Protein backbone atom coordinates (compact mmCIF):
# COMPACT_ATOMS: atom_id res chain seq x y z
CA UNK A 1 0.00 0.00 0.00
CA UNK A 2 1.04 3.67 -0.41
CA UNK A 3 2.23 4.97 2.94
CA UNK A 4 3.16 8.49 1.86
CA UNK A 5 3.82 10.80 -1.06
CA UNK A 6 7.20 12.51 -1.27
CA UNK A 7 6.34 16.05 -2.38
CA UNK A 8 9.98 17.10 -2.85
CA UNK A 9 10.86 14.17 -5.10
CA UNK A 10 7.30 13.91 -6.52
CA UNK A 11 7.12 10.17 -6.09
CA UNK A 12 4.91 7.62 -4.42
CA UNK A 13 6.48 5.46 -1.74
CA UNK A 14 5.38 1.87 -1.21
CA UNK A 15 6.06 -0.32 1.84
CA UNK A 16 6.93 -4.02 1.82
CA UNK A 17 7.11 -5.15 5.44
CA UNK A 18 7.00 -8.39 7.40
CA UNK A 19 8.73 -9.92 10.42
CA UNK A 20 12.14 -9.72 8.68
CA UNK A 21 12.11 -6.76 6.27
CA UNK A 22 11.07 -3.11 6.50
CA UNK A 23 11.44 -1.80 2.95
CA UNK A 24 10.35 1.32 1.07
CA UNK A 25 10.23 1.26 -2.74
CA UNK A 26 9.67 4.04 -5.27
CA UNK A 27 9.94 3.92 -9.07
CA UNK A 28 11.19 0.34 -8.82
CA UNK A 29 14.09 1.22 -6.53
CA UNK A 30 14.63 0.45 -2.83
CA UNK A 31 15.04 3.81 -1.06
CA UNK A 32 14.92 2.42 2.48
CA UNK A 33 16.08 -0.95 3.76
CA UNK A 34 15.95 -1.93 7.43
CA UNK A 35 15.61 -5.15 9.33
CA UNK A 36 12.41 -5.43 11.32
CA UNK A 37 13.18 -5.46 15.04
CA UNK A 38 16.79 -4.30 14.62
CA UNK A 39 17.61 -2.52 17.88
CA UNK A 40 20.01 -0.21 16.02
CA UNK A 41 17.41 0.69 13.35
CA UNK A 42 20.27 0.81 10.84
CA UNK A 43 19.47 2.25 7.42
CA UNK A 44 21.20 0.14 4.73
CA UNK A 45 20.13 1.90 1.51
CA UNK A 46 21.04 5.38 0.37
CA UNK A 47 17.74 7.29 0.43
CA UNK A 48 18.34 9.03 -2.91
CA UNK A 49 20.38 6.54 -4.99
CA UNK A 50 19.06 3.36 -3.36
CA UNK A 51 19.35 -0.34 -4.17
CA UNK A 52 18.14 -1.89 -7.42
CA UNK A 53 18.30 0.98 -9.90
CA UNK A 54 18.66 -0.33 -13.47
CA UNK A 55 20.86 1.08 -16.25
CA UNK A 56 20.93 -0.62 -19.67
CA UNK A 57 23.15 0.08 -22.67
CA UNK A 58 21.95 -1.34 -25.99
CA UNK A 59 22.60 -1.05 -29.72
CA UNK A 60 19.85 -0.80 -32.30
CA UNK A 61 19.99 -2.37 -35.74
CA UNK A 62 21.94 0.66 -37.04
CA UNK A 63 24.62 0.25 -34.31
CA UNK A 64 23.44 3.39 -32.51
CA UNK A 65 24.18 3.14 -28.79
CA UNK A 66 21.38 4.04 -26.36
CA UNK A 67 21.62 4.33 -22.57
CA UNK A 68 18.37 3.67 -20.69
CA UNK A 69 17.81 4.46 -17.00
CA UNK A 70 14.72 2.47 -16.08
CA UNK A 71 14.03 4.24 -12.78
CA UNK A 72 14.39 7.80 -14.10
CA UNK A 73 11.74 7.68 -16.81
CA UNK A 74 8.81 10.10 -16.71
CA UNK A 75 6.46 7.46 -18.10
CA UNK A 76 6.53 4.58 -15.64
CA UNK A 77 3.66 2.53 -14.28
CA UNK A 78 3.59 1.15 -10.74
CA UNK A 79 1.14 -1.59 -9.86
CA UNK A 80 1.48 -0.88 -6.15
CA UNK A 81 1.65 -3.55 -3.46
CA UNK A 82 -0.33 -6.75 -3.97
CA UNK A 83 -0.90 -9.22 -1.15
CA UNK A 84 -0.29 -12.86 -2.03
CA UNK A 85 -0.73 -16.10 -0.09
CA UNK A 86 2.68 -16.00 1.56
CA UNK A 87 3.74 -12.39 1.19
CA UNK A 88 3.67 -9.11 -0.70
CA UNK A 89 4.70 -8.10 -4.22
CA UNK A 90 5.32 -4.87 -6.12
CA UNK A 91 5.90 -4.21 -9.83
CA UNK A 92 6.72 -1.25 -12.06
CA UNK A 93 7.40 -0.89 -15.77
CA UNK A 94 9.06 1.79 -17.89
CA UNK A 95 9.86 2.10 -21.59
CA UNK A 96 11.69 4.27 -24.10
CA UNK A 97 9.72 2.97 -27.07
CA UNK A 98 12.34 0.38 -28.02
CA UNK A 99 12.75 -1.62 -24.84
CA UNK A 100 10.46 -2.08 -21.87
CA UNK A 101 11.90 -2.87 -18.44
CA UNK A 102 9.79 -4.53 -15.76
CA UNK A 103 11.10 -4.49 -12.17
CA UNK A 104 9.31 -6.59 -9.57
CA UNK A 105 9.88 -7.36 -5.90
CA UNK A 106 8.39 -10.20 -3.91
CA UNK A 107 8.67 -10.38 -0.13
CA UNK A 108 8.13 -13.86 1.25
CA UNK A 109 9.23 -14.95 4.73
CA UNK A 110 12.97 -14.22 5.10
CA UNK A 111 13.77 -13.31 1.48
CA UNK A 112 13.13 -10.26 -0.69
CA UNK A 113 13.38 -11.26 -4.37
CA UNK A 114 13.96 -8.84 -7.24
CA UNK A 115 13.31 -9.77 -10.87
CA UNK A 116 14.21 -7.67 -13.90
CA UNK A 117 12.72 -8.37 -17.33
CA UNK A 118 13.91 -6.60 -20.48
CA UNK A 119 11.58 -6.83 -23.48
CA UNK A 120 12.30 -5.71 -27.04
CA UNK A 121 9.09 -3.87 -27.93
CA UNK A 122 10.37 -2.62 -31.29
CA UNK A 123 9.95 -4.34 -34.64
CA UNK A 124 13.69 -4.80 -35.16
CA UNK A 125 16.35 -6.70 -33.24
CA UNK A 126 18.56 -5.00 -30.66
CA UNK A 127 21.72 -6.01 -28.83
CA UNK A 128 21.96 -5.64 -25.06
CA UNK A 129 25.55 -4.66 -24.28
CA UNK A 130 25.51 -3.69 -20.59
CA UNK A 131 22.97 -4.41 -17.86
CA UNK A 132 23.79 -2.75 -14.52
CA UNK A 133 22.17 -2.76 -11.08
CA UNK A 134 22.93 0.23 -8.88
CA UNK A 135 23.79 -0.56 -5.25
CA UNK A 136 24.25 2.54 -3.10
CA UNK A 137 24.44 1.86 0.63
CA UNK A 138 23.81 4.42 3.37
CA UNK A 139 27.26 5.92 3.82
CA UNK A 140 27.73 9.55 4.78
CA UNK A 141 30.75 10.41 6.89
CA UNK A 142 30.51 13.85 8.49
CA UNK A 143 33.14 15.66 10.52
CA UNK A 144 32.48 15.43 14.24
CA UNK A 145 29.84 12.70 13.94
CA UNK A 146 30.19 9.01 14.80
CA UNK A 147 30.87 6.78 11.80
CA UNK A 148 29.28 3.73 13.47
CA UNK A 149 25.77 3.94 11.89
CA UNK A 150 27.19 4.12 8.37
CA UNK A 151 27.03 1.03 6.18
CA UNK A 152 29.81 -0.20 3.89
CA UNK A 153 29.53 -2.71 1.06
CA UNK A 154 31.90 -5.53 0.10
CA UNK A 155 31.61 -7.41 -3.20
CA UNK A 156 32.78 -10.67 -4.71
CA UNK A 157 32.27 -10.81 -8.47
CA UNK A 158 32.66 -14.36 -9.72
CA UNK A 159 29.76 -15.99 -11.57
CA UNK A 160 26.60 -17.47 -10.05
CA UNK A 161 27.91 -17.25 -6.48
CA UNK A 162 28.77 -13.56 -6.66
CA UNK A 163 27.45 -11.47 -3.79
CA UNK A 164 27.47 -8.19 -1.95
CA UNK A 165 27.44 -7.84 1.84
CA UNK A 166 26.49 -4.68 3.72
CA UNK A 167 27.06 -4.01 7.41
CA UNK A 168 27.77 -1.21 9.85
CA UNK A 169 31.24 0.26 10.16
CA UNK A 170 31.42 -0.89 13.80
CA UNK A 171 30.39 -4.46 12.83
CA UNK A 172 27.30 -4.38 15.04
CA UNK A 173 23.85 -5.55 14.03
CA UNK A 174 22.68 -7.69 11.10
CA UNK A 175 24.37 -8.11 7.72
CA UNK A 176 22.44 -7.58 4.49
CA UNK A 177 23.27 -9.91 1.58
CA UNK A 178 22.62 -9.28 -2.12
CA UNK A 179 23.04 -12.33 -4.37
CA UNK A 180 22.03 -13.59 -7.83
CA UNK A 181 19.35 -16.24 -8.12
CA UNK A 182 18.46 -18.95 -10.66
CA UNK A 183 20.81 -18.67 -13.67
CA UNK A 184 21.84 -15.04 -13.13
CA UNK A 185 25.54 -14.24 -12.75
CA UNK A 186 27.55 -11.14 -11.91
CA UNK A 187 30.58 -10.71 -14.15
CA UNK A 188 31.66 -7.09 -13.75
CA UNK A 189 31.42 -4.08 -11.46
CA UNK A 190 32.52 -0.47 -11.37
CA UNK A 191 32.23 2.57 -9.11
CA UNK A 192 30.54 5.68 -10.44
CA UNK A 193 29.85 9.20 -9.17
CA UNK A 194 26.55 10.98 -8.64
CA UNK A 195 26.18 14.75 -8.48
CA UNK A 196 23.35 16.66 -6.86
CA UNK A 197 21.63 18.41 -9.79
CA UNK A 198 20.79 21.31 -7.46
CA UNK A 199 24.51 22.05 -7.00
CA UNK A 200 26.43 24.18 -9.47
CA UNK A 201 29.59 22.97 -11.21
CA UNK A 202 31.92 24.66 -8.71
CA UNK A 203 30.11 23.14 -5.72
CA UNK A 204 30.30 19.69 -7.32
CA UNK A 205 34.07 19.96 -7.71
CA UNK A 206 34.42 21.10 -4.11
CA UNK A 207 32.47 18.10 -2.75
CA UNK A 208 35.07 15.49 -3.74
CA UNK A 209 33.49 14.95 -7.16
CA UNK A 210 30.15 13.69 -5.93
CA UNK A 211 28.93 10.62 -4.05
CA UNK A 212 30.25 7.24 -5.13
CA UNK A 213 28.09 4.18 -5.70
CA UNK A 214 28.63 0.67 -7.06
CA UNK A 215 27.17 -0.78 -10.25
CA UNK A 216 26.98 -4.58 -10.55
CA UNK A 217 26.61 -6.17 -14.00
CA UNK A 218 25.35 -9.58 -15.18
CA UNK A 219 27.34 -8.60 -18.26
CA UNK A 220 29.04 -5.39 -19.41
CA UNK A 221 30.59 -5.79 -22.85
CA UNK A 222 30.93 -2.06 -23.61
CA UNK A 223 32.18 -0.96 -20.21
CA UNK A 224 34.62 -3.86 -19.94
CA UNK A 225 35.95 -3.11 -23.41
CA UNK A 226 36.52 0.51 -22.43
CA UNK A 227 38.25 -0.55 -19.21
CA UNK A 228 40.53 -2.95 -21.09
CA UNK A 229 41.58 -0.16 -23.45
CA UNK A 230 42.55 1.87 -20.39
CA UNK A 231 44.78 -0.94 -19.11
CA UNK A 232 42.44 -3.09 -16.99
CA UNK A 233 42.94 -6.86 -16.94
CA UNK A 234 39.55 -8.53 -17.31
CA UNK A 235 39.09 -11.78 -15.41
CA UNK A 236 35.60 -12.72 -16.62
CA UNK A 237 34.71 -12.97 -20.29
CA UNK A 238 31.86 -10.62 -21.18
CA UNK A 239 29.11 -11.14 -23.73
CA UNK A 240 26.08 -9.48 -25.30
CA UNK A 241 22.48 -10.63 -25.68
CA UNK A 242 20.62 -10.37 -28.99
CA UNK A 243 16.89 -9.75 -28.63
CA UNK A 244 14.60 -10.10 -31.61
CA UNK A 245 11.27 -8.32 -31.68
CA UNK A 246 9.13 -9.45 -28.73
CA UNK A 247 11.90 -11.44 -27.04
CA UNK A 248 12.63 -11.18 -23.32
CA UNK A 249 15.63 -11.71 -21.04
CA UNK A 250 15.35 -11.93 -17.24
CA UNK A 251 17.66 -11.46 -14.24
CA UNK A 252 16.89 -12.54 -10.68
CA UNK A 253 18.38 -11.45 -7.34
CA UNK A 254 17.65 -11.82 -3.64
CA UNK A 255 18.16 -9.76 -0.50
CA UNK A 256 18.80 -11.83 2.62
CA UNK A 257 19.62 -11.17 6.27
CA UNK A 258 22.30 -12.74 8.43
CA UNK A 259 22.33 -12.05 12.16
CA UNK A 260 25.98 -10.96 11.92
CA UNK A 261 28.49 -10.55 9.10
CA UNK A 262 30.32 -13.65 10.35
CA UNK A 263 27.13 -15.63 9.60
CA UNK A 264 26.70 -14.27 6.08
CA UNK A 265 28.57 -17.15 4.41
CA UNK A 266 26.38 -19.74 6.10
CA UNK A 267 23.24 -17.88 4.99
CA UNK A 268 24.44 -17.76 1.38
CA UNK A 269 25.23 -21.48 1.43
CA UNK A 270 21.71 -22.22 2.67
CA UNK A 271 20.38 -20.26 -0.30
CA UNK A 272 22.24 -22.49 -2.77
CA UNK A 273 25.33 -20.37 -3.38
CA UNK A 274 28.89 -21.61 -2.91
CA UNK A 275 30.50 -20.13 0.21
CA UNK A 276 34.30 -20.35 0.15
CA UNK A 277 36.86 -20.06 2.95
CA UNK A 278 40.54 -20.16 1.94
CA UNK A 279 43.50 -20.59 4.29
CA UNK A 280 45.93 -18.81 4.41
CA UNK A 281 43.95 -16.49 2.11
CA UNK A 282 43.96 -15.52 -1.56
CA UNK A 283 47.46 -14.03 -1.73
CA UNK A 284 49.83 -16.88 -0.94
CA UNK A 285 53.54 -17.73 -1.38
CA UNK A 286 54.53 -19.90 -4.34
CA UNK A 287 54.39 -23.61 -3.50
CA UNK A 288 52.45 -23.11 -0.25
CA UNK A 289 49.56 -25.49 0.39
CA UNK A 290 46.16 -23.84 0.19
CA UNK A 291 43.30 -25.33 2.20
CA UNK A 292 39.92 -24.52 0.67
CA UNK A 293 36.52 -25.21 2.23
CA UNK A 294 33.38 -24.94 0.10
CA UNK A 295 30.00 -24.94 1.82
CA UNK A 296 26.69 -25.38 -0.01
CA UNK A 297 23.52 -27.42 -0.25
CA UNK A 298 24.78 -29.22 -3.36
CA UNK A 299 25.86 -32.86 -3.22
CA UNK A 300 29.52 -33.81 -3.55
CA UNK A 301 28.97 -35.23 -7.02
CA UNK A 302 27.45 -31.92 -8.12
CA UNK A 303 30.50 -29.81 -7.19
CA UNK A 304 33.69 -29.90 -9.28
CA UNK A 305 36.77 -27.75 -8.63
CA UNK A 306 39.36 -26.93 -11.30
CA UNK A 307 42.63 -24.99 -11.19
CA UNK A 308 43.29 -22.56 -14.05
CA UNK A 309 42.85 -24.37 -17.39
CA UNK A 310 43.20 -27.90 -16.00
CA UNK A 311 40.67 -30.40 -17.32
CA UNK A 312 41.12 -32.68 -14.31
CA UNK A 313 39.23 -31.62 -11.15
CA UNK A 314 40.93 -31.24 -7.78
CA UNK A 315 40.04 -34.14 -5.49
CA UNK A 316 37.94 -33.53 -2.39
CA UNK A 317 39.89 -34.81 0.63
CA UNK A 318 37.17 -34.57 3.27
CA UNK A 319 33.46 -33.83 3.69
CA UNK A 320 31.43 -32.64 6.66
CA UNK A 321 27.68 -32.52 7.29
CA UNK A 322 26.56 -29.27 8.96
CA UNK A 323 23.63 -28.64 11.29
CA UNK A 324 22.27 -26.01 8.89
CA UNK A 325 21.50 -28.71 6.25
CA UNK A 326 24.57 -27.66 4.29
CA UNK A 327 27.68 -29.66 3.44
CA UNK A 328 31.34 -28.68 3.57
CA UNK A 329 33.93 -29.97 1.09
CA UNK A 330 37.67 -29.61 1.72
CA UNK A 331 40.44 -29.35 -0.89
CA UNK A 332 44.21 -28.86 -0.88
CA UNK A 333 46.35 -27.48 -3.70
CA UNK A 334 49.30 -25.18 -4.39
CA UNK A 335 50.51 -22.89 -7.17
CA UNK A 336 53.94 -23.54 -8.63
CA UNK A 337 54.05 -20.45 -10.85
CA UNK A 338 53.94 -16.79 -9.82
CA UNK A 339 51.09 -14.43 -10.60
CA UNK A 340 47.33 -14.74 -10.88
CA UNK A 341 45.48 -18.06 -10.75
CA UNK A 342 41.80 -18.91 -11.07
CA UNK A 343 39.93 -21.64 -9.22
CA UNK A 344 36.78 -22.54 -11.17
CA UNK A 345 33.87 -24.21 -9.38
CA UNK A 346 31.19 -25.90 -11.44
CA UNK A 347 28.05 -26.94 -9.62
CA UNK A 348 24.40 -27.76 -10.19
CA UNK A 349 23.18 -27.49 -13.76
CA UNK A 350 25.76 -25.36 -15.56
CA UNK A 351 26.34 -23.00 -12.63
CA UNK A 352 29.84 -21.71 -12.06
CA UNK A 353 31.78 -19.68 -9.51
CA UNK A 354 35.30 -18.27 -9.59
CA UNK A 355 37.94 -17.61 -6.92
CA UNK A 356 40.98 -15.50 -7.74
CA UNK A 357 44.41 -16.09 -6.21
CA UNK A 358 47.80 -14.42 -6.50
CA UNK A 359 50.99 -16.40 -5.90
CA UNK A 360 53.95 -14.39 -4.62
CA UNK A 361 57.58 -15.35 -4.21
CA UNK A 362 58.39 -17.52 -1.16
CA UNK A 363 58.54 -15.75 2.19
CA UNK A 364 62.30 -16.40 2.45
CA UNK A 365 62.86 -14.49 -0.79
CA UNK A 366 60.57 -11.62 0.17
CA UNK A 367 62.22 -11.32 3.59
Region annotations inferred by a language model:
Residues 1-115, 119-213, 229-233, 240-241, ...:
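Beta-strand-rich N-terminal accessory domains
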Residues 122-132, 263-266, 302-306:
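Short, hydrophobic/aromatic beta-strand segments
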Residues 245-248, 283-289, 324-326:
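Solvent-exposed, conformationally flexible loop/turn segments
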Residues 259-300:
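Extracellular ectodomain segments of secreted/surface proteins
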Residues 280-289, 350-367:
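An acidic-aromatic substrate-binding cleft motif
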Residues 303-305, 337-350:
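Short, aromatic- and glycine-rich surface loops/edge beta-strands on solvent-exposed regions
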Residues 320-331:
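Aromatic sugar-binding surface patches on proteins
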Amino acid sequence: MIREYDMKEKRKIYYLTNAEFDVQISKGMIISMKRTGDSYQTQYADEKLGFGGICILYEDVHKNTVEFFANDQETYQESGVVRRDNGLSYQTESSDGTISVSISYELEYDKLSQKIQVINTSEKEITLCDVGIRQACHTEFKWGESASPNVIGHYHIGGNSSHGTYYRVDGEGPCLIFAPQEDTQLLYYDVQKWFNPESNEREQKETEEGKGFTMLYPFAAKRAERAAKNGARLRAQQHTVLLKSGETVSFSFAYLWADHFLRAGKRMAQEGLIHAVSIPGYTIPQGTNVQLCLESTWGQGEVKVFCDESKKPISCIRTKECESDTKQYFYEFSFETLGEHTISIRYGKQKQAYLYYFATQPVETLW
